[in-house]
Amino acid sequence: PVENGLKFHADWLKGQKTGFFIDQRENRALLEKYAHGRDVLNMFCYTGGFSFYAMRGNARSVHSVDSSAKAIELTNKNIALNFEDDPRHKAFTVDAFKFLDDIDGQYDLIVLDPPAFAKHKDSLRNALRGYQKLNAKAFEQIKPGGILFTFSCSQVVTKEQFRLAVFSAAAQSKRKVRILHQLTQPADHPVNIYHPEGEYLKGL
């Protein structure tokens, strides 16, 4: 398949959703505009969508991280499909929290697009703590003047709850933070006003 001129492999049968998160395509295109000259970290990279948009946006370096070896294999295939053996890209099979603990302020654009932290309301409290912890680590590690793209795809987490978790993380890290964009799913993923949970993708 092709998205905005970029080719990608997708596992239609065994992959998550359709094998490629098409609901993030507008957000990937937005990231491309900010990537020029930056050192980019794509956490929970899955098939590497944000990574190859960052590559096309002339990022200085792009590092893709996922705990799944299969996801990293697919990311590397997609990078090679578009950029051959471009040395700007490196991929790591490791837990996201551990990776963030071990880096030392080397990235000035970080993407946090984790799988759903909560699928049921009884998991909501733990999910919000998880979002706060993850974003706090990113705020602590990002370079001054850096840009963070952060998302939640948990239906049971409202936009307001996610924002509060991110704001709490910013306060905890004692970093000055401004919102540049409020992000969501594209128009072909409409939200029924009688089913607000349909607005499952929230981002800043």
Language-model regions: role of each:
Residues 1-21, 29:
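Non-catalytic substrate-recognition/targeting regions of SAM-dependent transferases
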Residues 37-46:
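Conserved class I S-adenosyl-L-methionine
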Residues 47-60:
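Conserved SAM-binding loop of SAM-dependent methyltransferases across substrates and taxa
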Residues 61-66:
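Conserved SAM-binding motif I beta-strand of class I
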Residues 70-111:
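S-adenosyl-L-methionine
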Residues 106, 133, 147-204:
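C-terminal catalytic and target-recognition region of SAM-dependent MTase-like enzymes
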Residues 107-137:
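Mobile active-site "lid"/loop adjacent to the S-adenosyl-L-methionine
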Residues 142-144:
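Helix-to-beta-strand junctions that scaffold the AdoMet/dcAdoMet cofactor pocket
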